Amino acid sequence: MTPELNSFPRLAPGCRLNEKNQQPRTLLMPERALRLNGPSLEIVERCDGQHTVQQIIVEVQKIYSKAEPHKVEQDILGYLALLQKERALDFAL
């Protein structure tokens, strides 16, 4: 399911990012972990319940300004949907 643009993604209970000084940055989930870098890290760091999906898209598009904006948006929406399916994210309206 595609996340709504006005929703606020946040890490699901039991999920967290490892400390910033620990490399590689990792999304820790119950009984598994996902290494993050580049765009995936930029996205997950903003999933704090304070940024809307739309705000995350705009901020990441600024970072990757040479990429086609529509492609960046679709990639972000797809990644957020994947993390939701994996129960790593919750969304609030």
What are these regions (language model features)?
Residues 33-93:
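Long, charge-rich, low-complexity alpha-helical segments
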Residues 1-31:
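Long, low-complexity, charged/polar intrinsically disordered regions in eukaryotic proteins
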